[in-house]
Regions:
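Cleavable N-terminal export/targeting peptides
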Residues: 1-61, 271
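Transmembrane beta-barrel domains of Gram-negative outer membranes and organellar outer membranes
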Residues: 58-192, 206-215, 219-271
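Short loop-to-alpha-helix "cap/lid" segments that border enzyme active sites
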Residues: 197-203
Length: 271
């Protein structure tokens, strides 16, 4: 899709399984993983903006929720709108919708910074959280290997359940001939960001180009918490310069009881 980029991170979604509302709120406080207003009109406006502004193709800032090892070049600006929704109730997660905007800017020296706005989920009270993020790529080899580190700071500003939180990660990727890219790394979330206690684990990604317009992708956060989801899907070129993402997030726990939902993302570059 960060900076965590979580698509920018540009930018990264989860679930306290104790109750569905807590689960979805925790999930969207995070994304790796970011909304302004939860009105459906925001989605319509954002989609029109995506179509209207001419942009160049750019590196992918996140896969879906897991940050990619791509970093924007200096002066490049990327924006994205993520739309998550579950159309029906289940015993684990009730129906909901969420809109998550983010913007990412390349600052040079293989560094990008971004801002995500999370916490607006329908139905329920707004719990808007500002999530500034940074990603740095200290290594990019001609052998296809890359290494990045990143950090997200969570600052709740409405209906605060905690004062501040943090997500830090490090990961490597390997790009093979034909374009296949595998990503693997580790993460740490501080208390209250994705669970009532600190959580650490692994984050993984897979990207396989099919042609110039379509790729099959998937990512996964390990762990039983509000970021613990496996999300497979596709990345596609909506137009010559606009990218769309369509995936389905499946929880690491209680999936058989309905802990899964749709995830759509629309991204574009301003330059």
């Amino acid at each position: 899709m960060e900076t965590t980029t979580i698509k920018g991170e540009g930018t990264i979604v989860g679930n306290y399984q104790s109750n569905s509302r807590q689960a979805t709120e925790a999930l969207y406080r995070f994304k790796n993983q970011n909304p302004l207003s939860a009105q459906p009109v925001l989605f319509v406006i954002a989609f029109i903006v995506v179509i209207a502004f001419p942009t160049k193709h750019s590196a992918q800032q996140t896969i879906f929720n897991v940050p990619s090892t791509d970093v924007l070049d200096k002066g490049k600006v990327y924006a994205e709108l993520d739309v998550s929704f579950k159309p029906s109730d289940s015993s684990s997660v009730s129906k909901f919708s969420s809109f998550v905007p983010r913007v990412v800017v390349g600052t040079g020296s293989r560094v990008e910074i971004g801002l995500n706005i999370t916490g607006n989920i329908q139905p329920g009270p707004d719990s808007t959280t500002l999530v500034p993020a940074i990603k740095w790529k200290p290594y990019q080899g001609e052998n296809g290997w890359a290494f990045v580190v990143g950090d997200h700071l969570f600052v709740p500003i409405r209906n605060r359940a905690y004062d501040a939180g943090n997500y830090v990660y490090a990961e490597v990727s390997k790009t093979f001939k034909g374009g296949t890219r595998l990503t693997a790394g580790g993460y740490d979330f501080t208390k209250n960001v994705v669970a009532a206690a600190n959580r650490a684990g692994g984050q993984f990604g897979f990207e396989q180009p099919i042609n110039k317009k379509l790729s099959i992708v998937a990512d996964w956060f390990t762990g039983k918490h509000s970021a613990g989801y496996f999300t497979p899907g596709v990345v596609f070129k909506v137009g010559p310069r606009v990218t769309g993402y369509a995936g389905y997030s499946i929880g690491n726990q209680n999936a058989s009881n309905g802990n899964h939902f749709f995830l759509l993302e629309f991204g574009y570059n301003f330059n």
